[in-house]
Amino acid sequence: GVRLVGSEMCIRDRTVTVMAVTISNASCTLDEYNPSGYTMDALSASVEGYQTILNNVYFGMERALYGYGQFMQMTEGGTDIWTSQKNGDNLYLKYGMGSDFANNMMANTLNCCYDGICYCNQAIVQANKVPFTTEEEKNQKVAEAHFMRAVYYYNLVEQLGGVTLQMSPVEDVDLHPGKDTPLDIYEKCIIPDLEFAVQWLPVEERTTRPSKKSAMGMLARACLQSIEYDSSKKYAQRALEVAKEMVEDCKAGGAALGVYMYDNIEDVFAESNNFENKEALWKHRYVVGGVSNQAWIMNQNNEQFYCPLTAFSAIVFKTDIHSGNKYLSLIHI
């Protein structure tokens, strides 16, 4: 009986060995075929094809940053900068002191940000292969990718500190990536990318796609924020220069850059100015009507923190005695 079992085991071992060798040999001679033909180089053969690559730099932002409730939970949750819906006090457990976030909560945001970063890297590299009419046309397009890469890394650094800096398309999977310091990321990526975007993005008003004033606003913010990691404060002067240029343009009615401020605060939040708000340096319009992939959540972000003003009778509009502008104020009773 023992010899039979032993013989059977030997047969099984040989069978497994033969199968393993067969699979191994097959993998060595496998020719992959892409029936769609949509490779990065194929798309880059035309300006229209390159546009489809460039469109993907915004996907991570829409999916995990601006317009998604989870990012709001991470940035505002556990603070006093919130209020729940009327008769919806259970949101205290979601955004308030009672919140208990999952340990892997950041994973989705992290993945989506790096998804966006990788598409930015692809768009930057592939731009040199596209038959643009002029160098200016190419730079205006690729400036969008530089801007978005800076935005992704700015949010990652300010929420997580040091992260992995990836400035080129990924060739090999690194299972043990290291972390770059926040200042290195600012100096090697965020600030240079925004400087490029400031130089080449158009002045025209746009939605989702950034304009020159979008890049200038982010550049001033990034240069100022870098002081947190740099005791020499070498980018503070640049932040001041950019901010002053924007202030002067605003005083001139936005003649050069489109920087604008409404005379009355009510106009900032007026429904009529919702889609085309002149004060916005960069705006992104949420999907309307409900679609797949839970994009409908985007349309309800305002409700996460919404509470009817009628529930707070002590909040009223007051008028500034100097400017005449109205603002929200609390009446202490």
Predicted regions and their residues:
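Short coil/turn linking the two alpha-helices of tandem helical-hairpin repeats
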Residues: 157-158, 164, 205, 225-232
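An aromatic- and glycine-enriched ligand-binding surface/loop that stacks and positions planar moieties
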Residues: 29-88, 194-196, 212-331
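Secondary-structure transition into beta-strands, especially the periplasmic turns and strand N-termini
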Residues: 25, 129-146, 227-245
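Short linear capping/connector segments at secondary-structure termini
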Residues: 36-39, 97-101, 167-174
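Conserved, well-structured interaction surfaces
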Residues: 46-65, 87-160, 175-176, 181-188, ...
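Glycine- and aromatic-rich loop/turn segments at beta-sheet edges
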Residues: 164-169, 198-208, 254-265
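Bacterial Sec-dependent N-terminal signal peptides
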Residues: 7-8, 12-35
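Single conserved hydrophobic/aromatic residue that forms the stacking wall/gate
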Residues: 1-13, 331-332
